[in-house]
Amino acid sequence: MKEFRKISVIGLGLIASSICLTLRQKDPTIKLVGYDKDKVVRNRAKKIGLCKVESKLDNAVSGSQLIILCV
């Protein structure tokens, strides 16, 4: 199976949080980048250290080998 070094997660709600935490446990070195249109949700994700959070969608997906939609 292909190994992904950068994964973007679009939508940072409950499902995305579970996915990010699982990916982080599986490989702590993986680059996880998230985006949500809701600023409150983005701030919460930042606060708990879920992933690197971007405020612009194009920044979140740039260079990603895998994009997971959780909307």
Q: What is the predicted function of each stretch?
A:
Residues 1-54:
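NAD(P)+-binding Rossmann beta1-loop-alpha1 motif at the extreme N-terminus of oxidoreductases
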